[in-house]
Amino acid sequence: SLEATKSKKRYDLCTVARLEYRKGHHLVLESLYQIKKNYNLSLKYAILGNGPELSRLKDLVMKYNLIKQVSFIEENTPSSKIYSLSKIHIMPTVTTPQSIEGFGIANVEAAAFGLPCIVSDSGGTAESINDNGKMIKENNLIDLSNAILEVIENLSKYSKKSHQFAKRFENKKKIREYLNSF
């Protein structure tokens, strides 16, 4: 049995991000469908945010029959609440001609809550992860599904590394605040 099933967390995965194509929500949904089909594992996924992709994502939830697994959370819900109810933060961003993903501050916020992160090697999100999660090839569903299963099976190891990773940013923030006080 998977380690993660023992947890009291409501969601296995969450994404805190504007609902835009480049954030990769659609890839997570497709991956959840594949995992359910191939491993008979129904993972719960919380999506916090709003944006132009909302209706398309809801259509994908229907298409893949993930209604019982996926929750769209109102935008005014604090991200901290979703992080505290979730096990893993996932953002498999894709590069589009119009835009490229920036640093990925949500991944650092999630790490502060002990959430391992799964990101793609697209844009700046690669800098927001170290050994506190998995980096996958952009647009690679097999990579994404394998990363989800790997992190869920080794959740406590990745959670511990996430707390350690987030501490690096706390120290940098304290140093910056100190230097700015002069």
Please give the residue ranges for each predicted region.
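Conserved donor-binding/catalytic core segment of Leloir-type glycosyltransferases
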Residues: 6-23, 29-32
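A structural motif in glycosyltransferase catalytic domains
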Residues: 13, 28-32, 45, 144, ...
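Active-site donor-binding acidic/aromatic loop of nucleotide-activated sugar
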Residues: 53-56, 66-76, 82
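Acidic donor-binding loop of glycosyltransferase active sites
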Residues: 84-99, 115
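Nucleotide-sugar-dependent
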Residues: 94-108, 126-127
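Short hydrophobic beta-strand element within catalytic cores of glycosyltransferases
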Residues: 107, 112, 116-119
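Conserved acidic donor-binding segment of nucleotide-sugar-dependent glycosyltransferases
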Residues: 121, 131-142, 149-155
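A charged, aromatic-enriched C-terminal amphipathic alpha-helix characteristic of glycosyltransferases
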Residues: 139, 153-182
